[in-house]
Structures are given as structure tokens and as C-alpha cells.
Swiss-Prot record:
The lineage of its organism: Bacteria, Bacillati, Bacillota, Bacilli, Bacillales. Belongs to the KAE1 / TsaD family. The gene is tsaD. This is tRNA N6-adenosine threonylcarbamoyltransferase. It is found in: Cytoplasm. CDD domains: ASKHA_NBD_TsaD_bac. PROSITE patterns: GLYCOPROTEASE. The keyword Transferase applies.
């Protein structure tokens, strides 16, 4: 009989303090998330210093709550997985140091996890990953297309050349006058409007899987500025719809084309923007037409959480990819360099 593998996972890369216990790479025994949205809302975005202070205040309580929810003890675990980057360095260090302290105190292996690898493996909780596949990464800091031929094998075939898609959403939301976090607000508003603006679709070079959203973002900002200068009424829902349609069309087209070119029948979506209803519907429609299997995590697993770190950590554990107590946080880590040999 195969022994169960129990991973304690810690995630503090941005503005959520999260701790999870994952059994055998898919079973979530607990996934505690302490959100900081209300604290950052008055600033219109995440303030790194504020985020770090909240992590310091909440990490111990979050660990204890996750332990109670999972009904396990730390002595039962096989290893401790923690996000080492990319992310806000101050925030990362809180989680890394907490994980190192536990690893030292309980003599457990320490597993460093790439934050984007975690987002990818959130899909494995919904449905086991089958390879090869294409992963579309859409978040506040990343927009990438990744080809995977096996577990922990990452080949970045496309990425943003300027703004990440989530960053563009937040800036457009602020220009419209919506509250933080802007992405979900734009998505909700887009469902009520009509596509009345001819905002650009940026395709870049022929056959390129790279993205660019700065031009689209600027077009929206300039359009609203000009209308306000001329006292022309603005229908915010129409702005949101037109902007979102431009974004979704490009993301969907490039993801489907990548699947076709690489000969894969599996597309997964990862990152906070994967919660976007417009994007989810567009991908579902086009995957159905092209006979591609689509997996998108439930919204609660799209945003930052420790469960996804624990799932990725499970496969790193199986490969024996451990760190010593000199582990540090890193604001930038290349996903391909992190890839298994």
C-alpha cells in the first residue's frame, strides 16, 4: 500500500496570507486564506510595506487555523512547500522565513515553489493534468503561454512585452472610476454593456505568441480623457465591454493557435484573471469548436492560495527538489530556469 504524502504549503507572494495542507497532490485538507483587499482598497492597489506588515501579523494565526481545519499535526507532514518567488520581496520573506522555521523545528524537507508553477497546478486539483498541454497564464503580473510536455516541464512560448493583462485591467478600471480590485469590477460591468468602441487588438509579429496591452490601455485612457475634455457622456459599461472584448479576443486566439501548432488537445488557464467570466466563456466556446479539452480552476483557486503551492510542491517532493535553510525569497524567477531537467 502506497504511503500518503502530506504537504504543508505557505503562500505570501503578494497580498494574501495562505496556508494549506495537501494530501497526495490533489486532496485539499485545508486551504486558509487571509485576504488584505480591504486594507489596500483605500490606496487603489497593493502597497508592499502594508502587505508585508499584514503577513507578519497573520502568518501564525493562518498556520494554526489551517492545522485545525485539516485536523493534522505538523509532525504528520512529509515536507513544507513555500513560494520563493516571483512576488513582492518583503511579502515573500515572511512566508519563506516561516517555512524555514517550521522545517528547522520539525526536521522536515523544505520545497521552494515558483508562484506561476503553483497557479498552473491549481488546475490539477480540478482535473488531473495530462500531457502535452498549453497553459495560458493571466494575472496581475504575468501573461504567458507555456508548453508543458510533462510535470514541471515549462517552455515559455509567449509572454507580454509590456503590461500584464491584470495590470491593464486595473489601470482601465481606475480610469473608468471603479474601485480596487479593478479586474472583477470591469468584468461585471462588461456584462451590461455593448461593444461600441473600436479599441485595438494587438497581434504583434506574424506567428508570435507574445502579447502587448499597453497600447490598448492607452487607447482606453485617451478615449475617456478626450470625452471628458469635450463633455461627451461616457457609458462606462460600453467602455468595459469594448476593452474586455479586445483583451479576450487576443488571448483566446493565441491560446487556440498555440494548441494547434503544438499539436495538443489540452488547454489550461491559470492566474487571477482566469476568474474573468468573459474570458472563460470565450475559451469554452472556441475549445468546443476546435475539440480541445479546457480546464479552468474554480474562482477561489484562481486567486493566490497555498493549495496550489502544495500541489506543485507534491511533484517537486517526488523529484527530491529540496532547499536548505539558506533559501531566500526572489522577486523575479524565470519559469524556464525553474523547469525540471
Amino acid at each position: 500500500m502506497t504511503k500518503d504524502i502530506l504537504i504543508l504549503a505557505v503562500e505570501t507572494s503578494c497580498d494574501e496570507t495562505s496556508v494549506s495542507f495537501i494530501k497526495n497532490g490533489r486532496d485539499i485538507l485545508s486551504n486558509t486564506v487571509l485576504s488584505q483587499i480591504e486594507s489596500h482598497k483605500r490606496f487603489g492597489g497593493v502597497v508592499p510595506e502594508v502587505a508585508s506588515r499584514h503577513h507578519v501579523e497573520g502568518i501564525t494565526t493562518t498556520i494554526n487555523e489551517a492545522l485545525v481545519d485539516a485536523d493534522v499535526s505538523i509532525e504528520d507532514i512529509d515536507a513544507i512547500a513555500v513560494t520563493e518567488g516571483p512576488g513582492l520581496i518583503g511579502a515573500l520573506l515572511i512566508g519563506v522565513n516561516a517555512a524555514k522555521a517550521l522545517a528547522f523545528a520539525y526536521d522536515k524537507p523544505l520545497i521552494p515553489v515558483h508562484h506561476i508553477a503553483g497557479h498552473i497546478y491549481a488546475n490539477h486539483i480540478e482535473e488531473p493534468l495530462t500531457f502535452p498541454l498549453i497553459a495560458l497564464i493571466v494575472s496581475g503580473g504575468h501573461t504567458e503561454l507555456v508548453y508543458m510536455k510533462d510535470h514541471l516541464s515549462f517552455e515559455v512560448i509567449g509572454e507580454t512585452r509590456d503590461d500584464a493583462v491584470g495590470e491593464a485591467y486595473d489601470k482601465v478600471a481606475r480610469t473608468i472610476g471603479l474601485n480596487y480590485p479593478g479586474g472583477p469590477q470591469v468584468d461585471r460591468l462588461a456584462a451590461e454593456g455593448e461593444d461600441t468602441y473600436s479599441f485595438p487588438r494587438v497581434w504583434l509579429d506574424k506567428d508570435s505568441y507574445d502579447f502587448s496591452f499597453s497600447g490598448l490601455k492607452s487607447a482606453v485612457i485617451n478615449q475617456l480623457h478626450n470625452q471628458r475634455q469635450k463633455n461627451i457622456p461616457i457609458i462606462e459599461a460600453n467602455v468595459a465591454t469594448s476593452f474586455q472584448n479586445s483583451v479576450v479576443e487576443v488571448l483566446t486566439f493565441k491560446a487556440i493557435q498555440a494548441c494547434k501548432e503544438y499539436g495538443v488537445q489540452r488547454l489550461i488557464v491559470a492566474g487571477g484573471v482566469a476568474s474573468n467570466k468573459g474570458l472563460r466563456q470565450s475559451l469554452a466556446d472556441q475549445c468546443k469548436v476546435n475539440d480541445i479539452q479546457l480546464t479552468i480552476p474554480s474562482p477561489k483557486l484562481c486567486t493566490d492560495n497555498a493549495a496550489m503551492i502544495g500541489v506543485a510542491g507534491h511533484y517537486l517532493y517526488q523529484q527530491g527538489r529540496f532547499a536548505d535553510l539558506a533559501l531566500n525569497g526572489h522577486s523575479n524567477i524565470d519559469l524556464e530556469e525553474y523547469s525540471a531537467e
